[in-house]
Amino acid sequence: MHTDLDTDMDADTETVALCSSSSRQASPSGTPTPEADTTLLKQKPEKLLAELDRGGPPPAPGVPRRRGSMPVPYKHQLRRAQAVDELDWPPQASSSGSSDSLGSGEAALAQKDGVFKVMLLGESGVGKSTLAGTFGGLQGDNAHEMENSEDTYERRIMVDKEEVTLIVYDIWEQGDAGGWLQDHCLQTGDAFLIVFSVTDRRSFSKVPETLLRLRAGRPHHDLPVILVGNKSDLARSREVSLEEGRHLAGTLSCKHIETSAALHHNTRELFEGAVRQIRLRRGRGHAGGQRPEPSSPDGPAPPTRRESLTKKAKRFLANLVPRNAKFFKQRSRSCHDLSVL
């Protein structure tokens, strides 16, 4: 015997079943159920870790994949919903432009292939870019600007009947990136041209500081360094004499040459001389079987050499050249000859 209460309970049970069935039928096929959400939550950590191991999070639909040439810092991997600005951190490596050519991993291969890298150093306004552009146009059609770089030039030249590839980098001044880029230049160059203007004594006085920074960063290398007095055609505006430039070169154990990038005077001699200096110093290192700098039995040579250069630079800047004029004359006698050590 069924009572009204039993009838109501049966009706309620049937209503609940119908509602549940209707709810399942009304759900779109693409909408995840709670069970599917649980499965996705279980799978997300493993998938995310796998993507992080490969270098970054999975790209969102419609968003192009990031190039794999530069690793993304972990803090940017966590910003899943934000665009990553590649200038937010100092780049450590690059696969295009000048930074790729500067990679230290290619140094040995570059030497075998006869590729020499020459860095232009010096203060702003001394004519580095004009020198680089002049180098790029020495042979017309045979010169070309490197791809993806505005300040790097590469060309094949014949020096002493042997063809080499010479790459000239005018990237010493690059705005906010100048600090780390300058250090990278100092570590990877094969020869260094420290350019000053003969019409600007301040740029001339900065030469010892630049050279000391270079040799402090690479104390175990016999680096070819040429002091370049540019704008020699501006005779009426000259502030640095030829003799002063040679004296400084003799003091700092460098080569010296005066050029006029505007008139293409001595520009060919400069870059061919840089190639000769690289060959001569590498040949001397191979012949001696060790680093050519003098060594001391009481300790390593680099600190002593750096200290000596500092003292010499101070003596020069303190106007002590006249007292040692004979010594400097002997040291600077061949500093203008780029075909000898």
From Swiss-Prot:
Residue numbers bearing the Phosphoserine modification: 27, 296
Residue ranges with Acidic residues bias: 1-13
Comp. bias regions, Low complexity: 94-105
Residues that, per the record, bind GTP: 122-129, 230-233, 261-262
Highest taxon of the lineage: Eukaryota
Primary role: Binds GTP saturably and exhibits a low intrinsic rate of GTP hydrolysis.
Main localization category: membrane
Native source organism of the sequence: Rattus norvegicus
Keywords assigned: Cell membrane, GTP-binding, Membrane, Nucleotide-binding, Phosphoprotein
UniProt biased composition (Polar residues): 18-32
Protein name per its UniProtKB record: GTP-binding protein REM 2
Chain intervals with Basic and acidic residues compositional bias: 43-54
Entry's localization field: Cell membrane
PANTHER family for the chain: GTP-BINDING PROTEIN REM 2 (PTHR45775:SF5), RAD, GEM/KIR FAMILY MEMBER 2, ISOFORM C (PTHR45775)
One GO CC term, this protein: plasma membrane
Family annotation (InterPro entries): P-loop_NTPase (IPR027417), RGK_GTP-binding_reg (IPR051641), Sigma_54_int_dom_ATP-bd_1 (IPR025662), Small_GTPase (IPR001806)
